[in-house]
Amino acid sequence: MYICVIFKKQLNNSEEILLKNPYKHNGTITSTVLKKTSSKFTKKAYIESYGCQMNFSDSEVVASILSSNDYEITSKPEDASLILLNTCSIRDKAEQRIRKRLNDFNHLKKNDSKIKIGVLGCMAERVKHKFLEEEKIVDIVVGPDSYKDLPNLIEKAKNNIEAVNVILSKNETYGDISPIRINSNKISAFVSITRGCDNMCTFCVVPFTRGRERSRDPNSIINEIYSLEKKGFKELTLLGQNVDSYLWYGGGLKKDFSNASDLQKKTSITFDKLLKLIAETFPKMRIRFSTSNPQDMTTEVIKIMMLYENICKHIHLPFQSGSNRILKKMNRLYTREEYITLIKKIRKLIPDCGISHDIITGFPSENEKDHEDTLSLMEYVKYDFGYMFAYSERPGTLASRKYEDNVSLTIKKRRLTEIINLQQKHSHIRMKSFIGKTICVLVEKNSKKSDLKWSGRTTQNTVVVFEKKNFKVGDFVDVKIKDCTSGTLLGDAISYSKSI
């Protein structure tokens, strides 16, 4: 057993506090140095986030950096002297929405010229000149690997100096930053474990906006989870563009692992080892992870999920298309048959595992047979839920350079409707299978439709709504399921649960 001891004393602004890590690895106890944050906030900042869970996690890192520089995070943009939008580039619709919000915020700026507006995240590289120089609708542009430079960029903007940093890093993971949970329910939290991606799917901008794949030091991951546990959090989601390819060998890009020393290779930590470590270190904490790429998910990970109750029985496993021809054009490095084999393995080892998906319909040259292949794969798996989109060509991606976007919008919409309708049918089938069963639910928040009811999730990531009674947010409750919709289970609370 290793004991965490924190020595406290009165700190001056220039001093630092040293936190000893309770996790010992390879015979050494690591330490994280955190700057003391001021107890007096002199400025206010507003952060608005779009897109994937990673963006929302990044916004919590940004909030921490700003807090260390005397900014209070506010939920009201009209109260802020600094307005930041953490942006998403995955679809054109998201970019259009962000542009609209920038115009809204510039109306605020007309009444107060001291307000500074910044764009963060995946849009930064592509729009830096357009938004900053041509349209002049932002003052600051910051890429995903440059958030530590924000205080410097803010000062530049105040002095009318170009404030841009979109440089991608080979080693930045923000492992030394303690995130501020600005959008949290104080029960569930995101914990980033990897950044970037090496897969180069032809439809995706992530490798160009977030850089090459690198993994975070497991010591800093354990430290962050330890802090969450002490604050009363009950659930965490391990985040990465591709969590299953997590690989720690002392730091550096995953692609450089072949050049590592024999000792580094021997002591390296893969995702299954990290998952086991976290499950054993925090047995009372629910653990989720997202997202998995089918080509990288191993049998070892599935077995670890099977062995530990606190690892949630849900896998988000995007397949994008059921057609081998389209998968190849997408540069997805698995076949339909290999994907089905993986599904069979999951069902065999974890029969009650919830499985969700991502699907892109209308990819260049997709024909009716390709579409039918997608529908037939859905019929085979019968997913619990999924995220379904029509293909949106993104500038700078390999697909935009190699393929003509030649599937009409009408056909895309029709195919998407068919996919959504089929998924709703399958979701209802999965939901009805819970009726009559008593299942453990983590209470998260009020139901959207009634303040007299709680909303929470099962281990399969299924939403459950039930009467509040004497239970509270953060409780694990056994709920007997009475009815359902295609998206929600409805039940009666029985008692506090002995499970998680």
Q: What role is predicted for each listed range?
A:
Residues 5-19, 34, 399-500:
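Terminal RNA-binding accessory module
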Residues 201, 221, 238, 289, ...:
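Conserved, mostly hydrophobic/aromatic
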Residues 148, 199, 244, 295, ...:
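Glycine-centered loop/turn positions within well-structured domains
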Residues 240, 291-293, 319-321, 357-361, ...:
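Active-site proximal loops enriched in glycine and acidic residues that flank catalytic Cys/His/Asp
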Residues 183-187, 197-199, 311, 321, ...:
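Short flexible coil/turn linkers enriched for glycine and charged/polar residues
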Residues 4-246, 270, 337-348, 372, ...:
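Proteins enriched for Cys/Gly/acidic motifs involved in redox and nucleic-acid/cofactor modification
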Residues 117-121, 126, 230-368, 379:
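Conserved SAM/AdoMet-binding glycine-rich loop
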